[in-house]
């Protein structure tokens, strides 16, 4: 993994419990807490964010999401896709996480994720392609996180890791190959 000075600084700040906001490098890794990185441009319409996500442990708890600004906590993140501690991938829908279909994950496997975001409607859909497999739709027209119903623009990619039910940080995930483009019909 190629680490850039900004990524190293972000990891150090996160370890100290301080939020980080900066540009997206080639590869970013979550840690305990929130890290945020600038999208290439602030988004105000319908758009897609695609990226490769790799969980570094089984049954971890971490998400990748999109927010308006550097988040202070998870309530500030509008759209999220998560590797949960039950070993499946789920998506935030308003006030809770769920998925339209169950998709398990394994440590150190790459999952191509695509979030199709409709900012005007405050809805998004999520598609995931496990390495070597076709893309599947996990979420169709899910609502933004309840606290983000009034957001007008999105400009940050957010990575986060959390402690599991036993109070232990169970692992991080990596994100690479981030791309942003105008939304196409799924």
Residue ranges and their predicted role:
Residues 1-8:
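Bacterial N-terminal signal peptides that target proteins for export
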Residues 129-154:
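Short, solvent-exposed beta-strand-to-loop segments that form ligand-recognition rims
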Residues 22-89, 182:
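Secretory/extracellular carbohydrate-interaction modules
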Residues 17-21:
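Sec/Tat signal peptide C-region and signal peptidase I cleavage site
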Residues 165-177:
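Extracellular carbohydrate recognition
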């Amino acid at each position: 993994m190629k680490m850039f000075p900004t990524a190293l600084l972000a990891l150090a700040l996160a370890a100290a419990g301080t939020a980080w906001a900066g540009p997206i490098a080639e590869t970013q890794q979550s840690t305990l807490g929130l890290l945020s990185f600038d999208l290439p441009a602030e988004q105000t319409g319908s758009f897609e964010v695609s990226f490769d996500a790799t969980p570094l442990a089984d049954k971890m708890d971490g998400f990748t999401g999109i927010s308006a600004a550097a988040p202070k906590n998870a309530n500030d993140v509008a759209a999220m896709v998560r590797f949960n501690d039950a070993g499946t991938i789920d998506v935030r829908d308003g006030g809770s996480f769920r998925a339209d279909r169950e998709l398990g994950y394994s440590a150190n496997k790459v999952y191509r994720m695509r979030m199709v975001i409709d900012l005007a409607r405050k809805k998004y859909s999520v598609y995931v392609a496990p390495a070597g497999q076709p893309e599947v739709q996990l979420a169709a027209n899910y609502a933004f996180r309840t606290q983000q119903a009034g957001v007008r623009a999105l400009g940050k990619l957010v990575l986060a890791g959390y402690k599991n039910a036993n109070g232990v940080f169970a692992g991080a995930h990596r994100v690479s190959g981030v791309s942003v483009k105008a939304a196409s019909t799924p």
